Amino acid sequence: MADQAQDVRPTEWGPGKTPQGRARLPSSRPREKPQLSCNLCRRRKLRCDRQRPCSSCAQRELGLSCTYASDRVLSNGVAHQTRTTTQDRIRHLESLVYDLMQNSSANVNAQDQVGATPSPRGQPRGPDYPTPAAVHAPSTNEEPVSAAVSPADYGSMQSTGGGANYVGSAHWAAVLDGIAELKDHLDNEESHHSDSQGVDPPCPQVTGPQLLYGCPKPADKDEILSSIPARSVVDRLVSRYFNSFEMSPAVLHSVQFLKEYEAFWEDPQTTSPIWLGLLFTIMCLATQFEKSRLDPGVQSPAVLSMERELQEMVDTFRLRIPQCLVLGSYAKGGPFVLETLMLYIAAEIFLSSDAEIEIWILMGNTVQLALHMGYHRDPKHFKGLSPFAAEMRRRIWATIVEMDLGLSAQMGLPRMVKHWQTDTQEPSNLQDSDFDSATVEMPPSRLNTDLTPILYRLVKARLMTTIGYIWDFSADVRPYPYTEVQKMDDKLDLARKSIPECLKWHSMARNITDSPQHIMQKVILETVFYRAKIVLHRKYMFLPLAQSASSRRIVLESALKLLDYQHMLQEETQPFCQLYQERWRVSSLVNHDFLLATSILCYYLQHAWGATQRVSESDSFDETIMASLRRSHDIWLQSSNSSKEARKVVRALAVVLGRVNTPSADSVGEAGLVFGLPSTYPPSTTNDYSQETPGGLGSQFPMFNSALMPNWATFADDLISAPMITPTAEWQEMDETVDAMGSLNWPWNLQ
């Protein structure tokens, strides 16, 4: 008994022990009971009544953010309830947006009654355009029209891992997001739940201009000079650049550059690092042009070896450019800084299959440097500038303004250079041989009928001036009268009519004697014109106004014309065709216009078939649009392997055209079988000599004119095309966005 009494031990007390002697569980152990309170109340340690939304969140006006942990693992039945709740939240958001629209209109009307805002001084030379403030001046009795009729008209905001990406309502991605608005909200919730799990994303690979991230490997001048090829190679690259790139006369004076080029080879060590960076940009662009001349269909060892060698040269030259800029302290400005940055941006554009936000930011830095160096003020205001320097400053500034507008439109953001900030006159139409650094007095400008290398840049700059005002109007958050839209439309038509005959597009049949570069110049002038038409009238397509039918007609006609140009470029950039060697010119900037046209036609079909009041022109016209979209689908499919943007449009088109079983972007070889169409298509209507482009927009569609198109049945077939490989722009991930749209019951489903 004594031995047994000794075996009975008293209950142990102490740290980590319970009164019963069991080990105390660590406080860090997760609770096994389910979380019943909402996430916000749990985080704030508040009492939660477990309602949807709970009273605590409702009192703090956080009802839309009141979520529960159990929402992540819902069954099918409860998932339907969550979707219903999400729809209620969307309706609530729409009501808030509508209230904000009403308040905004009331505030604008109140401001108009006080008085008109005086227009800023310093208007540039050119047509008399109204300033954004002058649009709201009470010069007429017409009330401003609020064109925003849906949340999508405020632009599109996409949340991505580290932040948010915004594009304006005139951007093609915002147009598509307006179609898939519900799915976008669901995707945002899914991404929010994924982020809340605390999974760190992998380190992203740095893309785009390396200059924004600092030189990964700083280099001295000796190392930079050692990477320059032999002079025979550099001579060929410089020649290729000046003979291929139409932007070269607007940035560099060929005669002056040759003098500096010879001085470099005489004594490379005394050459400034910035000029070396300029030389590397020229070689980088020229090497890209040479690489694009290789036939992608030939896979012989010699061709593959040449392709690898050229790509290595491009990578080396691309690395040296930011090293030279940093070594030369480019942020302080100075000679050749703007020229190097502009060509560097051009090289990055051609290298990217998707639009890079870094390129737009680098363009902003270039604009700031140009302002710092006074390029926005005309040289006549300053003494000490030679006639040669003054003319080159005008050329460079005109190109900067054009690049700013083009990249801003591609990103769907307001441009950085405003017309009231500058008074720099346009450059003269002169050959490089007409003046040099020794010129005392500049010769008179040549006539517009004289097709000089700089004429295209001048004509495009004039057209882009008008388009710039239109882009400013589209980015203006204030409403303005529809009469202002009509005025801008008239000015745009006049700007197009002022294009010299030598740069006007008629048809491919009338351009067979032109150089490929000349043909592309004409096409680009046409595409930017029709893009501006869409941007100007898009918001008024479905407004309850008498003018909405006119705007809808202009938008649809412009979109169809843009896709017709896309189809023509697809055909003419094939082997043995006229533009095959110049296919590199179809860059992401050019494709942006085709993306906008594709998206706007999808947007129209959704409204035409889904609206309670029919807004469709006709059933046959809708079939024409779908035929054109089918052909564009095949074209986008070819570039979907290398472009996120193309994948997004391909999936959107698959839904809009009612093809749920569309193959993935990897099935590029099956492009001709996607819609049951043959692999070859009739030629584009843009190639037809009889299909002329009208001088202006008439009251009827050109394709409905019996004189131009007597056989309507054959016209629908003419809008079907084959694929091409083109770089496109990068936007937010939407690989899954359109997938869920396939489950919706689309009224125009063709199956």
Curated annotation (Swiss-Prot):
InterPro entries tied to this protein: Sec_Metabolite_Reg, Transcription_factor_dom_fun, Zn2-C6_fun-type_DNA-bd_sf, Zn2Cys6_DnaBD
Cellular component terms (Gene Ontology): nucleus
PROSITE patterns named among the record's database cross-references: ZN2_CY6_FUNGAL_1, ZN2_CY6_FUNGAL_2
Biased composition (Polar residues): 107-116
Compartment annotation: Nucleus
GO BP: DNA-templated transcription
Positions of region (Disordered): 1-35, 107-153
Classification via Gene3D superfamilies: Zn(2)-C6 fungal-type DNA-binding domain
Main location: nucleus
GO molecular function, one term: DNA binding
Gene null: resulting phenotype: Fairly reduces the production of fusarisetin A.
Full protein name: Fusarisetin A cluster transcription factor fsa6
Species, as recorded: Fusarium sp. (strain FN080326)
Gene: fsa6
